[in-house]
Regions:
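Membrane-embedded alpha-helical bundles that constitute the cytochrome b-like, heme-associated redox core
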Residues: 1-137
Length: 137
C-alpha cells in the first residue's frame, strides 16, 4: 500500500534522524570520559534522538490506518511488515524502560537491546520497501 510521497519522505527523514542521532550518540557516549565536549555532545544528541522519537511515534500512529491495516487486509508484504512492526514495538518498550526505569541492573540490558534493535530496524525498513516494490512490479 503505497503512501503519499510527502508523508513517505517525511517518515524516511524522521527515521533517518533517529538512526543518525542514535549512532552519533553511541560514539559520543563511548568518548564521554575522554573530553567534556563529548559529554555535552552526547547530551545534545540524546535530545535530538528523543525529539525524533516523538515524531516517529506520530508517524507510526499514522502508518497504522494508512499502511499497516490496508496491507494486512490485502495480504501484502506481511512477513517483513510484521517484523518492522514488532521491531518498532520493541524499540518503544526499551526506550520507555531506558527513560523511566531507574534500575541499574536492567538499564545496561535495555540499552543494548535498544541499540541492537535500532540497527536491525535500519536494515529492515529498506528491505521492507524493496520487497514491497518488487511485489508491486
Amino acid at each position: 500500500m503505497r503512501l503519499r510521497s510527502s508523508f513517505r519522505y517525511w517518515t524516511y527523514a524522521v527515521f533517518s534522524v533517529l538512526l543518525l542521532s542514535g549512532a552519533a550518540w553511541l560514539v559520543a557516549d563511548w568518548q564521554k570520559d575522554a573530553d567534556e565536549a563529548w559529554q555535552q555532545a552526547a547530551a545534545n544528541l540524546l535530545m535530538i534522538h528523543g525529539g525524533a522519537a516523538m515524531l516517529a511515534l506520530m508517524a507510526l500512529g499514522a502508518l497504522i490506518p494508512l499502511h499497516l491495516l490496508r496491507a494486512w487486509r490485502a495480504r501484502k508484504n506481511l512477513v517483513s511488515g510484521i517484523t518492522v512492526a514488532i521491531v518498532n514495538a520493541l524499540l518503544i518498550v526499551t526506550a520507555f524502560g531506558l527513560y523511566y526505569l531507574g534500575s541499574e541492573t536492567v538499564r545496561p540490558w535495555m540499552s543494548w537491546i535498544h541499540i541492537g534493535t535500532g540497527f536491525f530496524l535500519a536494515l529492515m525498513i529498506p528491505l521492507h520497501i524493496m520487497l514491497g516494490r518488487r511485489a508491486r512490479a
